[in-house]
Design a protein with these regions (language model features):
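The conserved beta1-alpha1 loop
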Residues: 76-78, 210
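Primarily recognizes the serine-hydrolase "nucleophile elbow" in alpha/beta-hydrolase
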Residues: 147-152, 158-202
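A domain-start/cap signature at the N-terminus of enzymes
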Residues: 6-72, 170, 223-226, 233-235, ...
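C-terminal catalytic histidine-bearing segment of alpha/beta-hydrolase fold enzymes
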Residues: 189, 196-197, 205-209, 213-267
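Active-site machinery of serine-nucleophile hydrolases
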Residues: 79-139
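Gly/Ser-rich "nucleophile elbow"/oxyanion-hole loop immediately N-terminal to the catalytic nucleophile
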Residues: 65-67, 123-165
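Short, solvent-exposed loop/turn and secondary-structure capping segments
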Residues: 68-70, 84-88, 121-125, 174-175, ...
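Short, proline-enriched alpha-helix->beta-strand connector loops that line the catalytic pocket
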Residues: 106, 201-206
């Protein structure tokens, strides 16, 4: 275990890092400012198939040449944003991508679906004695939409990323497990892992983040996944000390996400 401050690199595969938020007051104000960013630049839409539907918002970067291609970032929300107002899912991990600095340094399509029901449900894995997650047809609809977007928009198919918080972190692992061919990397923040497709994920860069004091989603599931995957996969773990479920966001985390994702590319 490595205990590091903000100044050191913390992204070596196979390593677990204890993260100390040394400027918690500054982090809170920084995250609060991002939460207040206007979302009018995101186009509203709705996906429908048979008896299911999923609303979404999509941000498109500024295209300056026909040859330009951009990453796509899929961001899943937690259970507190379940609904159909197409607004509650627009939390800091979505809005961070459209700060003036990030729009310039990390231009990307940002897709933020809002699920009308839980996108992941949990059950006890009897072999591991930890929770495991599983998804439903609403996730399938979103993944099919990405296939459609790839044909319509100048998306770089080697740089499609998926990330999420809480239930969204779980759904991130469900999406990777369903479509390992689609994604270049994934970030699971405070979610619950899926264990039955681990072999398919060993070549996908994974970043796990969890608060050590989290009682909403115990870190046990993600720690178990990390321990099993660290020897032959591409995964590293941020163990955020003295963080619980709903205060996991920090300036360091939010700043590091686009930097790390943009370095990942499918070969």
């Amino acid at each position: 275990i490595f205990i590091l401050s903000c100044t050191a690199s913390k992204n070596t595969f196979g390593k677990k890092y204890e993260i100390l938020d040394i400027d918690s007051l500054g982090s809170k104000s920084y995250v609060a400012a991002i939460r207040n960013i206007d979302i009018s630049e995101f186009k509203e839409g709705e996906l429908k198939k048979e008896n299911i539907s999923v609303k979404y918002r999509l941000f498109s970067p500024e295209v300056s040449s026909k040859s330009q291609k951009f990453p796509l970032v899929l961001v899943f929300h937690g259970s507190g944003a379940i609904g159909n107002d197409n607004t509650k899912q627009m939390y800091a991990l979505v809005k961070n991508w459209i700060t003036p600095e990030n729009k310039e340094k990390y231009p990307a399509y940002i897709l933020a679906p809002q699920f009308p029901i839980r996108s992941s449900n949990y059950h006890l894995d009897p072999n591991r004695n930890v929770l495991a997650s599983e998804s439903n047809e609403h996730l399938d609809l979103v993944l099919q939409y990405i296939d459609s977007l790839k044909k319509q928009l100048p998306i770089d198919g080697s740089r499609i990323y998926v990330m999420g918080f809480s239930m969204g972190g779980s759904t991130t692992m469900n999406a990777l497990s369903k479509r390992p061919d689609l994604f270049a990397a994934g970030i699971n923040i405070s979610g619950i892992s899926q264990f039955d497709k681990m072999e398919d994920l060993k070549n996908i860069p994974l970043w796990y983040i969890h608060g050590s004091l989290d009682t909403d989603n115990s870190p046990k599931s993600n720690l178990q996944f990390f321990e099993e995957m660290k020897g032959n996969g591409k995964i590293f773990f941020w163990d955020c000390k003295d963080k619980w479920h709903n205060n996991i966001a920090s300036k360091e985390l939010i700043d590091t996400i686009p930097k790390w994702l943009f370095k990942q590319q499918k070969k």
